[in-house]
């Protein structure tokens, strides 16, 4: 999907700049979002942590001084909800997504931005594997393979 590809390219292209701008308050908020999502997924009546998912990604990029990037990412999450990608897939998928989020946030908090970016790209592949194809940026060589599952 072209919109998902745009999101993947934006998030990876602006990753280093965005995470370098995060404040201690932002880092605490990211950790709280991971904890809230984990709580929702461990309840007897599981709740889908869509708002936490959206907020986690938008928090990482919200300090960018670029209203176009922030606006496009916000529109992506609106579309994500509109086409019901926020609906229940299966518990294993949701748990895998949030394990990635936890590791991404831990890497950011530790200042390991390259590791966080690597995990972000792996995390995006989960969506592709779920049946929502997207093109993901490859490594530093700039090649962008189309991932279709």
Label every PLM stretch briefly.
Residues 89-93:
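Solvent-exposed loop and edge beta-strand segments that line ligand/cofactor-binding
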Residues 112:
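Phosphate-/nucleic-acid-contacting segments
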Residues 1-12, 16, 20, 133-149:
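Short linear motifs at protein or domain termini
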């Amino acid at each position: 999907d072209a919109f998902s590809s745009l999101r993947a390219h934006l998030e990876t292209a602006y990753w280093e700049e965005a995470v370098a701008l995060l404040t201690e308050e932002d880092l605490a908020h990211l950790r709280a979002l991971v904890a809230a999502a984990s709580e929702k997924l461990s309840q007897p009546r599981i709740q889908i942590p869509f708002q936490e998912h959206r907020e986690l990604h938008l928090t990482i990029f919200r300090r960018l001084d670029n209203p176009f990037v922030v606006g496009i990412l916000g529109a992506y999450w609106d579309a994500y909800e509109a086409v019901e990608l926020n609906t229940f897939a299966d518990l294993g998928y949701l748990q895998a997504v949030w394990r990635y989020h936890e590791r991404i946030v831990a890497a950011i908090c530790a200042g390991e931005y390259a590791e966080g970016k690597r995990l972000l790209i792996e995390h995006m592949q989960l969506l592709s594997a779920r049946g929502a194809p997207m093109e993901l940026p490859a490594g530093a060589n700039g090649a962008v393979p189309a991932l279709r599952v």
